[in-house]
Amino acid sequence: MIKLLVLWLLILTIFLKSPTVEGDVSFRLSGATTTSYGVFIKNLREALPYERKVYNIPLLRSSISGSGRYTLLHLTNYADETISVAVDVTNVYIMGYLAGDVSYFFNEASATEAAKFVFKDAKKKVTLPYSGNYERLQTAAGKIRENIPLGLPALDSAITTLYYYTASSAASALLVLIQSTAESARYKFIEQQIGKRVDKTFLPSLATISLENNWSALSKQIQIASTNNGQFESPVVLIDGNNQRVSITNASARVVTSNIALLLNRNNIAAIGEDISMTLIGFEHGLYGI
């Protein structure tokens, strides 16, 4: 009888305890290869619940409540120092991170909400002096993404900077972190570009930047195309590998069939909007000679 009572109390405790963030994903830089990085990005994509597939591309859910809205990435540098990164699974946006017993969150409403569910045991919480969009981060970093190296060595440096929180270089480190995780999950091209640089860095191309700037637009038009005979309602202009503008008008384009790996739910696009980066402004005003 006592054993049954103990078992019942154990089961009750499991079901009534506070919900926790699940679906954690880990990546270690020590011994990392192109393959292990690819597995990490694959695991990240699989940690994001989706509503259905559109043209065989997972369409992220429009809304998830409570702790289920977030997953954690545990990233370890060459020196065996780990940061944990909180990601909103509905849009792959990074909310903040934990280093030791200190949590750091972006200065925005969505990150404030995330702090109610992640890193609650941190002894200290720091609100960063900027939000998580590209425009704000580039302003804080004093440079645009094209001038910030990527690659696994760059990710190692970013983790180290964030682990010790070097304020003067944190924004640049966060830009590296976002592109090495969220953007790689969104696009196979970006995953491949970063993953093949195991022991060296590179500067992202304008093609990479244009993909990052247009994830919302592509997601929206791909969803429209699924009920419009494969045609986009409005073209999405990207930059190709030759730094030329290309107009994407339908779901048969290669960026749809073999590149984009996740779709932002169109119910969230109006609320989130497209990040307006310095680079995009440069495109519009011809500052890059395109």
Swiss-Prot record:
GO terms for molecular function: rRNA N-glycosylase activity; toxin activity. Disulfide bonds: none annotated. Keywords: Glycoprotein, Hydrolase, Plant defense, Protein synthesis inhibitor, Signal, Toxin. Transmembrane segments: none annotated. SUPFAM superfamilies: Ribosome inactivating proteins (RIP). Residues 271-290 form a propeptide. Residues 1-23 form the signal peptide. It catalyses: Endohydrolysis of the N-glycosidic bond at one specific adenosine on the 28S rRNA. It is an enzyme of class 3 (hydrolase). Appears to undergo proteolytic cleavage in the C-terminal to produce a shorter protein. Its EC number is 3.2.2.22. InterPro entries: Ribosome-inact_prot_sf (IPR036041), Ribosome_inactivat_1/2 (IPR017989), Ribosome_inactivat_prot (IPR001574), Ribosome_inactivat_prot_CS (IPR017988), Ribosome_inactivat_prot_sub1 (IPR016138), Ribosome_inactivat_prot_sub2 (IPR016139). Changing residue 212 to K: 10-fold reduction in activity. The active site is at 183, 212. The keyword NAD does not apply. One of its GO terms (biological process) is negative regulation of translation. Glycans are attached at residues 214, 250. Especially useful as immunotoxin for pharmacological applications as it has low toxicity in rats and mice but is potent once inside target cells. The keyword NADP does not apply. Ribosome-inactivating protein of type 1, inhibits protein synthesis in animal cells. Belongs to the ribosome-inactivating protein family. Type 1 RIP subfamily. This is Ribosome-inactivating protein bryodin I. The lineage of its organism: Eukaryota, Viridiplantae, Streptophyta, Embryophyta, Tracheophyta.
